[in-house]
Amino acid sequence: MAITTAASRLGTEPFSDAPKVELRPKASREEVESVIRAVYRHVLGNDYILASERLVSAESLLRDGNLTVREFVRSVAKSELYKKKFFYNSFQTRLIELNYKHLLGRAPYDESEVVYHLDLYQNKGYDAEIDSYIDSWEYQSNFGDNVVPYYRGFETQVGQKTAGFNRIFRLYRGYANSDRAQVEGTKSRLARELASNKASTIVGPSGTNDSWGFRASADVAPKKNLGNAVGEGDRVYRLEVTGIRSPGYPSVRRSSTVFIVPYERLSDKIQQVHKQGGKIVSVTSA
């Protein structure tokens, strides 16, 4: 699976030329176990799973040849385990983004896809929402009955929209990253750009772009100091913060908040942010 020459910086290098994980006829026990691990890793967004959380019955059916990989994927996606991780505590649009990522290996291409699944869930429920991905022609033509879903959004394919390549990197934040261990939490990553029909700039998942999980705020947060320096010197910094929770602080539903701070007050501001429970995701020159 050739991706790009920047694979190491985008966190996709482990998938370069990696073979598809497939359950073949007369597979050995080790091969079956490898398939089970691959399904859990991909469908659960690389989140940790306890031994007590494993789907013992579905695993047994797969080992005995009474369940295809496709149906095992369906069992995981419909399980209480999946719901606890991604359904009960997430915005509906976030769940749809993750369903596309986990079950079809790509990001939504446009807002109409999200609207369709919102309507489907409202009218027919959770199980119908999951079935719509796994029973789709797209799933069948790419994974069939016995291939574990993988990230298709990293490569160019027939019928793929270019925006999908950029958007998959809003959902995928590195090989070792988990879908439940990101700065933006359970909020939608793509709602704003899908609504405006724009694709965001790709931001690498590691230190290549100032911090691990950071991307510049897409709203009105200032990106530059628009006036004169306000300190004794001319060094002014842009401090981007997320997750501030403190009495009297406005609760604004957005991924980050920006402060323009002179150098001599930078240390004090950082301490204040930490006391308010915030996370500093970027410090750049303003």
From Swiss-Prot:
GO terms for cellular component: phycobilisome; plasma membrane-derived thylakoid membrane. Gene3D superfamilies: Phycobilisome linker domain (1.10.3130.20). It comes from the Bacteria. InterPro entries: CpcD-like_dom (IPR008213), PBS_linker_dom (IPR001297), PBS_linker_sf (IPR038255), Phycobilisome (IPR016470). It is a peripheral membrane protein. Its main location: membrane. Keywords: Antenna complex, Membrane, Photosynthesis, Phycobilisome, Thylakoid. The keyword Membrane applies. Residues 234-286 form the CpcD-like domain. It is found in: Cellular thylakoid membrane. Residues 2-180 form the PBS-linker domain. Pfam families: CpcD, PBS_linker_poly. Belongs to the phycobilisome linker protein family. Rod linker protein, associated with phycocyanin. Linker polypeptides determine the state of aggregation and the location of the disk-shaped phycobiliprotein units within the phycobilisome and modulate their spectroscopic properties in order to mediate a directed and optimal energy transfer. Associated with the phycobilisome, a hemidiscoidal structure that is composed of two distinct substructures: a core complex and a number of rods radiating from the core. This is Phycobilisome 32.1 kDa linker polypeptide, phycocyanin-associated, rod. It comes from Nostoc sp. (strain PCC 7120 / SAG 25.82 / UTEX 2576). The gene is cpcC.
